Amino acid sequence: YADGAPRMDAAIFEQGIPTLGICYGAQRLALELGGKVEQTGAGEYGKVQMRVAGGAMFAEQPAEQTAWMSHRDTVTAPPAGAAVVATSEHTPVAAFEDKARGVYGVQFHPEVVHTPHGQEVLKSFLYAVAGAAPVWTPAAVSEEQVERIRAQVGSDRVLCALSGGVD
């Protein structure tokens, strides 16, 4: 929300594409849609207890759960039409959803191992909210890439150097 911060193109919200903002992304979504983001003076860093009050991303999850937060600024008022679906001691809007616009935001980090139900949150967004099919597998990606390479290279030979991400 700082002066000069990049803005989102408002046309994005007219596309009907389910959108999930995580941490700063949630703050940005809230601001773009008329919500409020402030520095509360009580930032959170690390594991916090979060209270969940329903919501599509939290279906069949415990009402109290641990989440990993890393922020000084936070959404203090969700956009009009959005429901607050999770809070923590210092974060009045730990998660919000606007089903009508397909906009969802979480202040915490569902992608890290320190958020035990984080993968469930992401799966719920992908499958229940966005309607994605769980058909992706590493083997399928590998097979697809081999087919693409064979189509391009034909009977020629290829030298491939591949990093496993540990170098």
Please report, for each region that a protein language model flagged, where it lies by residue:
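RNA-binding accessory domains that recognize and position tRNA/RNA substrates
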Residues: 1-2, 6-20, 27, 31-167
